[in-house]
């Protein structure tokens, strides 16, 4: 028998077979969880009271019903807040059904989804509008009273007898359906359809004008004067806005006050919401487009829902409307009323504007040295805001005649005043109209630049200034761009002289300006001009009286005023003009006129410098004031307006 395995040295210890039993907790490949204790035995006690099988009492049922109702209300309010946030129109409007109407037009498929059953009548409508029960705004009595039915029942023209019978049955069914529907819902649908139809109309302005007249009882055109261009600026504007949210009406006064000097605000309520009528005077002139953008931002409405025009400032009816409504409790007024309202509503102003006086207009033109008709008309019309006589002029139908008469009389007065003055008085008179002192040195420096001795020039200039016979004509000759015309034009500008041109020599009246001139200039005399002067003007250059032909007037006998001539031809070098050598004093300007790097003249020959020149050299030119005139002139200022006697008590 073979040896038993594992039995060596039998008898010395444990011998024989023994049984080993292993305990397997997890089979091979089993994943052991880290967060659970696998050794804990599940006794089943944690499943106790998992299901509540206790008796339900009456009080617990009421609490559960109350909790369910509160949860439902909370969910409903949350849904409504989301609807207001995401389904609202871009402009806040009290007409809340417009939002869903716009939504249905943008997405017809979304509008077709219905959770409630609609009546059969809806299928026959072309446009369907829904009611927003959660809008928060109710329909006013005006909307309920003016609501009209949207569709009219009728029989199709193309249908036969059978179709007519079916249509009749459908109409009868619809009538029963309408009887079941609430009356308020029909009115709301009708009002919404009318507003949508208005917004879709081609002439929105006409619809707004009609609604304005319906609300305020007068036409918008009666208060305004229309401007065609949106870029024309004006200080006063009349604005009518429609469909404004009621919350804006409370804050509009505070919003518009920093932008305006005067505001007349009226608010009314109609089926479209709040309607605004406001007369504004801004701090600066604004155009219609600027006013529209500003108020569209303040009122939160589109620009096409506003009527914006300037007020009718010459209408007494319009001024009376703003005045009467301003003192009533229907309006809010900010600031002082414009002068055009006060002028037409206060009795004293009305009496002062009743009669126009031409003498006041002539006196104004004389004082401001304005003799041109167009300038008189424009400048005097600008005074209509504060001058009662100018307002009467604007209200007259003979403005053209008044302007012509005023210009004629002003020229007569000016001409008589000029002829009455000597050259010394005239230079002083012209200098008194120029402000500033100036500097006489640039004139002397320019003469030296042209190689002209100042003392001989001053002697001959004195004889020319006083109109000495055969010495009352000075010719400045030389090459081009030497400053001849610049020198003579600056002198004529200071002395208030006139300019004649040989280009008009074909006319008999080209010498007519010499009649009304104290000094004169003939610029750029050419060869034909010198020939004409040598042929016809010798007696005139001698300083003797000469007859001048005037247009539409008789011949006038005048003495030629001091005459300046500029030319590129030196008559002293040509023998054919020998008869003019003794009648014309000639100075030559040989050097070009200098300019600096910036293109400015080096020698400034301005009116202020000429004023300083005559004041500085008055004794050399024999135009200084006498001892009797040093204290001022004794003559009074010219007045063509009759004086008034003040009667004291």
From Swiss-Prot:
Enzyme class, broadest EC rank: isomerase
Gene3D superfamilies the record matches: 3.40.1310.10, P-loop containing nucleotide triphosphate hydrolases, Zinc finger, large T-antigen D1 domain
Any one Gene Ontology cellular component term annotated for this protein: host cell nucleus
InterPro entries for the chain: Helicase_SF3_DNA-vir (IPR014015), P-loop_NTPase (IPR027417), PPV_DNA_helicase_E1_C (IPR001177), PPV_DNA_helicase_E1_N (IPR014000), PPV_E1_DBD (IPR046832), PPV_E1_DBD_sf (IPR046935), Rep_E1_papillomaV (IPR016393), Znf_lg_T-Ag_D1_dom_sf (IPR037102)
Alphabetized PROSITE patterns for the sequence: SF3_HELICASE_1
Post-translational modification, as annotated: Phosphorylated.
PTM sites of type Phosphoserine: 89, 93, 107
One Pfam family this sequence matches: PPV_E1_N
Positions contributing to ATP binding: 478-485
Keywords: ATP-binding, DNA replication, DNA-binding, Early protein, Helicase, Host nucleus, Hydrolase, Isomerase, Isopeptide bond, Nucleotide-binding, Phosphoprotein, Ubl conjugation
Cross-link (Glycyl lysine isopeptide (Lys-Gly) (interchain with G-Cter in SUMO)): 559
Domain of life per record: Viruses
Annotated stretches, region: DNA-binding region: 187-353
Any one Gene Ontology molecular-function term assigned to this protein's record: DNA binding
GO biological process assignments: DNA replication
Motif position, Nuclear localization signal: 83-85
EC number from the UniProt entry: 5.6.2.4
Region annotated Disordered, chain positions: 138-169
Catalytic activity: Couples ATP hydrolysis with the unwinding of duplex DNA by translocating in the 3'-5' direction; ATP + H2O = ADP + phosphate + H(+)
Domain SF3 helicase, residue spans: 452-602
Function field: ATP-dependent DNA 3'-5' helicase required for initiation of viral DNA replication. It forms a complex with the viral E2 protein. The E1-E2 complex binds to the replication origin which contains binding sites for both proteins. During the initial step, a dimer of E1 interacts with a dimer of protein E2 leading to a complex that binds the viral origin of replication with high specificity. Then, a second dimer of E1 displaces the E2 dimer in an ATP-dependent manner to form the E1 tetramer.
Assembly behavior: Can form hexamers. Interacts with E2 protein; this interaction increases E1 DNA binding specificity. Interacts with host DNA polymerase subunit POLA2. Interacts with host single stranded DNA-binding protein RPA1. Interacts with host TOP1; this interaction stimulates the enzymatic activity of TOP1.
Protein family membership: Belongs to the papillomaviridae E1 protein family.
Protein name: Replication protein E1
Name of the encoding gene: E1
């Amino acid at each position: 028998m073979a040896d038993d395995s594992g039995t060596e040295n039998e008898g010395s210890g444990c011998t024989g077979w023994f049984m080993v039993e292993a305990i397997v907790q997890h089979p091979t490949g089993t994943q052991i969880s880290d967060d659970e204790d696998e050794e804990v035995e599940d006794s089943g006690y944690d499943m106790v009271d998992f299901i509540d099988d206790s008796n339900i009492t009456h009080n617990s049922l009421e609490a559960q019903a109350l909790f369910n109702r509160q949860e439902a209300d909370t969910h409903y309010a949350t849904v409504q807040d989301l609807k207001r946030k995401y389904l609202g129109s871009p402009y806040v409007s009290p007409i809340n059904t417009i939002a869903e109407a716009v939504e249905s037009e943008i997405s017809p498929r979304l509008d077709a989804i219905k959770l409630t059953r609609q009546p059969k009548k809806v299928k026959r409508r072309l446009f369907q509008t829904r009611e927003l029960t959660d809008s928060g705004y109710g329909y006013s009595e005006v909307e309920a009273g003016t609501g009209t039915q949207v569709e009219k029942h009728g029989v199709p023209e193309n249908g036969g007898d059978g179709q007519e019978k079916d249509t009749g049955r459908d109409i009868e069914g619809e009538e029963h359906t309408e009887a079941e529907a609430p009356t308020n819902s029909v009115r709301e649908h009708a009002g919404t359809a009318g507003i949508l139809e208005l917004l879709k109309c081609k002439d929105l302005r006409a619809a707004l004008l009609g609604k304005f007249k319906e609300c305020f009882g007068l036409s918008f055109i009666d208060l305004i004067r229309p401007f065609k261009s949106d870029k024309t600026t004006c200080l006063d504007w009349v604005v009518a806005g429609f469909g404004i949210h009621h919350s804006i009406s409370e804050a509009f006064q505070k919003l518009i006050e920093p932008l305006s000097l005067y505001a007349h605000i009226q608010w009314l309520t109609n089926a479209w919401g709040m309607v605004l009528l406001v007369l504004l005077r801004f701090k600066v002139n604004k155009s219609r487009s600027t006013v529209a953008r500003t108020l569209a931002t303040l009122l939160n409405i589109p620009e096409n829902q506003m009527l914006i025009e300037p007020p009718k400032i010459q209408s007494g009816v319009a001024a009376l409307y703003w005045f009467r409504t301003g003192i009533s409790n229907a309006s809010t007024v900010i600031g002082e009323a414009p002068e055009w309202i006060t002028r037409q509503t206060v009795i004293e102003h009305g009496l002062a504007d009743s009669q126009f006086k031409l003498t006041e207009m002539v006196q104004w033109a004389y004082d401001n040295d304005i003799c041109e008709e167009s300038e008189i008309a424009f400048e005097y019309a600008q005074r209509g805001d504060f001058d009662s006589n100018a307002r009467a002029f604007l209200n007259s139908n003979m403005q053209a005649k008044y302007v012509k008469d005023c210009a004629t009389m002003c020229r007569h007065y000016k001409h008589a005043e000029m002829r009455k003055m000597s050259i010394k008085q005239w230079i002083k008179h012209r200098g008194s109209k120029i402000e500033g002192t100036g500097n006489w040195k640039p004139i002397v420096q320019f003469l030296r630049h042209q190689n002209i001795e100042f003392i001989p020039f001053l002697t001959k200039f004195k004889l020319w200034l006083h109109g000495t016979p055969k010495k009352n004509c000075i010719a400045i000759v030389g090459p081009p761009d030497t400053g001849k015309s610049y020198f003579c034009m600056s002198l004529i500008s200071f002395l208030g002289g006139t300019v004649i041109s040989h280009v008009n020599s074909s006319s008999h009246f080209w010498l007519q300006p010499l009649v009304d001139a104290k000094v004169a200039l003939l610029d750029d005399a050419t060869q034909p001009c010198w020939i004409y002067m040598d042929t016809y003007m010798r007696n005139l250059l001698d300083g003797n009286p000469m007859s001048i032909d005037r247009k539409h007037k008789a011949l006038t006998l005048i003495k030629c005023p001091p005459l300046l001539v500029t030319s590129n031809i030196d008559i002293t070098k040509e023998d054919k003009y020998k008869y003019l050598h003794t009648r014309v004093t000639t100075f030559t300007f040989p050097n070009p006129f200098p300019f600096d790097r910036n293109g400015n003249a080096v020698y400034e020959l301005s009116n202020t410098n000429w004023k300083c020149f005559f004041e500085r050299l008055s004794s050399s030119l024999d135009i200084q004031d006498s001892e009797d005139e040093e204290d001022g002139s004794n003559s009074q200022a010219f007045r063509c307006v009759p004086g008034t006697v003040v009667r004291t008590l």
